[in-house]
Design a protein with these regions (language model features):
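Single conserved hydrophobic/aromatic residue that forms the stacking wall/gate
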Residues: 1-11
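Membrane-entry segments of alpha-helical transmembrane domains in multi-pass membrane proteins
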Residues: 4-5, 39-61, 78-83, 142-159
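Membrane-interfacial loop-to-helix junctions in multi-pass inner-membrane proteins
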Residues: 4-5, 71-92, 108-116, 147-152
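Hydrophobic alpha-helical transmembrane segments of multi-pass integral membrane proteins
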Residues: 9-17, 54-67, 87-99, 157-166
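Membrane-interface interhelical loops and short amphipathic "cap" helices
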Residues: 17-51, 102-151
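Membrane-interfacial helix termini and the short, flexible loops that connect transmembrane helices
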Residues: 18-31, 64-82, 102-111, 137, ...
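An acidic- and aromatic-residue-enriched active-site/binding cleft used to recognize and process polar
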Residues: 40, 53, 73-77, 98-99, ...
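Long, contiguous internal "core" modules enriched in hydrophobic/ aromatic residues
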Residues: 147-148, 152-181
């Protein structure tokens, strides 16, 4: 499922990335303005963004259903524990992909989601401040928050997820498909 969606997703990101502005000099206002431009003035912009939005929902559902299938058939057992852990990491990064993309329009919903996310990060014992700074460019919401999410969503997460998918598929290829237990 992930691989068949990959090239179309790359194309959609390139088109959306040409017109999206995460903000400049700590001001997130251009993010909302550029999203408004994509949705209202760019030819087929509404369709491209909607396809990107809905395929994201499909991706999260597909990964979740795949994890359920692996769990209920017992395919995570010996000798496939490492592949299960990679799959759990892929599920986490898929959800974080959706979350980081959810913040990019920087409307009132995105601001609320960022507030919840930064409060959750700050409440993590011992490493909360570091986690908040790494994810949101500070321990409070600032103009750099949307820029950080854009950077994670467009540059870091695709590399991490693609690497994990390749490792996941390589292990499946090396060990073979698990028989249900």
């Amino acid at each position: 499922v992930e691989r068949s969606r990959g090239l179309g997703d790359v194309y959609k990101r390139q088109v959306l990335g040409l017109y999206y502005v995460p903000g400049g000099e700590g001001d997130p206002t251009p993010a909302y303005s550029s999203m408004e431009f994509i949705m209202t003035q760019l030819p087929f912009g509404y369709i491209i963004r909607s396809i990107h939005h809905w395929t994201t929902h499909f991706m999260v559902a597909a990964v979740f259903l795949h994890m359920c299938r692996v769990y209920f058939t017992g395919a995570y057992r010996n000798p496939r524990e490492l592949n299960w852990l990679i799959g759990v990491a892929l599920m986490f990064f898929t959800i974080f992909f959706g979350y980081s993309g959810y913040l990019l329009p920087w409307d009132s919903l995105a601001f609320g989601a960022a507030t919840i996310g930064i409060n959750m990060a700050n409440s993590t014992p011992l490493i909360g401040g570091w986690v908040a700074t790494a994810m949101f460019a500070g321990t409070t919401i600032s103009g750099q928050t949307v820029t950080r999410m854009y950077f994670l969503h467009v540059f870091i997460l695709p590399v991490v997820v693609t690497s994990l998918i390749l490792a996941h598929l390589f292990i499946v290829w090396a060990q073979g498909i698990a028989e249900p237990h």
